[in-house]
């Protein structure tokens, strides 16, 4: 395959995704095929987002690293010293992707490191390694193209997380604002009693202790449940089982209590 055909191979993988999130494993496998090298897509914290192996490396530490999908902390930190594509790093470098304890077996091992950037920050690193020949300019063009695609995908995921967090927070705030003063007071006492994200409570006991009617507690729980903030289930004489579904609820409730 020439450079154009290889680029088209990557494009075909992207077009196949058609608006869906790009799978990091698929991206690694496509780059592995067109560049003919081992490919590792590593997050800024060293998590292995995706990888594909062209030449198997028989080493227990490497095997464990792939199983745990985590690069060593020290190695990951050192990668941040590389701010632009660094091709053909040999086995004696601290940046080699080959096991240094087996240097003699991997004398010809070469590593190429491509920073993954986006939104003005370092998002991760694309690491390529192979034994048989140097990485040439065509390989580097494909690697940098791949790193750009991965960077865009990481940014998209981060934007989705922020959006989801904002949505969860808004749902909680709306649910809390729908409560009357006495219902809010009841909810505060319920979750003090619960002391966590799920548990069992007896509504009548809380009603007697706080000095409110049981119906206030029932209404308050019903409002939160209809908003999807909690799940509640009556267990008859044992009481009511409650589970928090929205992880923003308890922190927002705490803010109200301290304000």
Swiss-Prot record:
Residue ranges: DNA binding: 203-222
GO molecular function: DNA binding; DNA-binding transcription factor activity; GTP binding
Entry's Gene Ontology BP terms: negative regulation of DNA-templated transcription
Matches recorded under Pfam families: CodY (PF06018), HTH_CodY (PF08222)
Domain of life the protein comes from: Bacteria
Keyword set includes Metal-binding: no
Keywords: Cytoplasm, DNA-binding, Phosphoprotein, Repressor, Transcription, Transcription regulation
Chief site of localization: cytoplasm
Annotated segments matching region GAF domain: 1-155
Signal peptide: none
UniProt cross-references to InterPro entries, sorted A to Z: CodY, GAF-like_dom_sf, GTP_trans_reg_CodY_C, Transc_reg_CodY_N, WH-like_DNA-bd_sf, WH_DNA-bd_sf
UniProt key word Transmembrane helix: no
Modified residues (Phosphoserine): 215
Record family assignment: Belongs to the CodY family.
Role summary: DNA-binding global transcriptional regulator which is involved in the adaptive response to starvation and acts by directly or indirectly controlling the expression of numerous genes in response to nutrient availability. During rapid exponential growth, CodY is highly active and represses genes whose products allow adaptation to nutrient depletion.
Record protein name field: Global transcriptional regulator CodY
Species this chain originates from: Geobacillus kaustophilus (strain HTA426)
Lineage: Bacteria, Bacillati, Bacillota, Bacilli, Bacillales
Gene: codY
């Amino acid at each position: 395959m020439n450079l154009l055909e290889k680029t088209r191979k990557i494009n075909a993988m992207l077009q196949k995704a058609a608006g869906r999130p790009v799978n990091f494993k698929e991206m690694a496998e496509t780059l592995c095929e067109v560049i003919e090298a081992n490919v590792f897509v590593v997050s800024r914290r060293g998590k292995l987002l995706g990888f594909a192996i062209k030449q198997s490396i028989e080493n227990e530490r490497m095997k464990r690293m792939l199983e745990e999908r985590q690069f060593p902390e020290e190695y990951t930190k050192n990668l941040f010293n590389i701010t632009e594509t660094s091709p053909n790093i040999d086995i004696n470098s601290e940046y080699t992707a080959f096991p240094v304890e087996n240097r003699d077996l991997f004398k010809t091992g070469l590593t190429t490191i491509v920073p993954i950037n986006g939104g003005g920050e370092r998002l991760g690193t694309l690491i390529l390694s192979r034994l048989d020949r140097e990485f040439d300019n065509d390989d580097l063009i494909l690697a940098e193209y791949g790193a750009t695609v991965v960077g865009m995908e990481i940014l998209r995921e981060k934007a989705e997380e922020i959006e989801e967090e904002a949505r969860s927070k808004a749902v909680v705030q709306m649910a809390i604002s729908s409560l009357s003063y006495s219902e809010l007071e009841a909810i505060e006492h319920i979750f003090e009693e619960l002391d966590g994200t799920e548990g069992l409570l007896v509504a009548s006991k809380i009603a007697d202790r706080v000095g409110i009617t049981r119906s206030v507690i029932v209404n308050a729980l019903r409002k939160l449940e209809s908003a999807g903030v909690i799940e509640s289930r009556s267990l008859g004489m044992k009481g009511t089982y409650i589970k928090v579904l929205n992880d923003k609820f308890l922190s927002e409730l705490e803010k109200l209590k301290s304000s």
